[in-house]
Amino acid sequence: MGKLVLVRHGQSQWNLENRFTGWVDVPLSDLGIQEARKAGTLLKGMKFDQAFTSKLQRAQNTLKFILEEIGQKDLPITQDQSLNERHYGALQGLNKKETADKYGDQQVHIWRRSFDVPPPKEKTDLNPEGISESLKDTAARTLPYFNSRILPLVKAGKNILVAAHGNSLRSIIMDLDHMTKEQVLELNLPTAVPVVYDIDASGKILKKQELN
């Protein structure tokens, strides 16, 4: 049996400012650092074999503070863009109230809470076609990586720690818990609260708990 621990990053500066963040690489807030360290204290006594995180510093630093607290600063870490947050397209950087004022509450609610409707695309010189993701798009990016790189280690009896983001982790939990797309839309992951799965060699979940 292996353990899989999923942790959403601590509060970021843009969480604090109520902005759409997505792939923008913003730091943790002071509270976010405290939350990450608290997550570490909740995981003390657990020995990990490997950690995975995204390419964004708020997840990487959450992992760093957790590993400091549990005394495993030398744990092997793999960073991959597959675990990045959902890309919020042209909404990235906008205050959520300002966005609602601009587009209307109902439209913003659809972008945030529908499974397969992405926000308007963000177009740049490097990407003139533009990019944005729905939760469905995020899952299509995250799940193949999780199922090929992370879950096999857990099924082999390893203890694995994943520090990532609300929507990439929702995608993983949706798959593990066999949730419908309607159910996953109601799933809210608080910042820096570890979710612990005990998983056997067949991939069956033996136990799930939140540590808070």
Task: List PLM regions with ranges.
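Short catalytic helix/loop segments, enriched in acidic residues and glycine
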Residues: 22-38
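ANL superfamily AMP-binding
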Residues: 33-46, 145-151
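Glycine-rich N-terminal loop/short-helix segment of MobA-like nucleotidyltransferase
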Residues: 12-25
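Short beta-strand scaffold positions
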Residues: 53-54, 162-164
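Phosphate-coordination/substrate-recognition cap region in phosphate-metabolizing enzymes
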Residues: 37-112, 116-121, 174-198, 202-205
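GST superfamily/GST-like fold recognition
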Residues: 166-171, 206
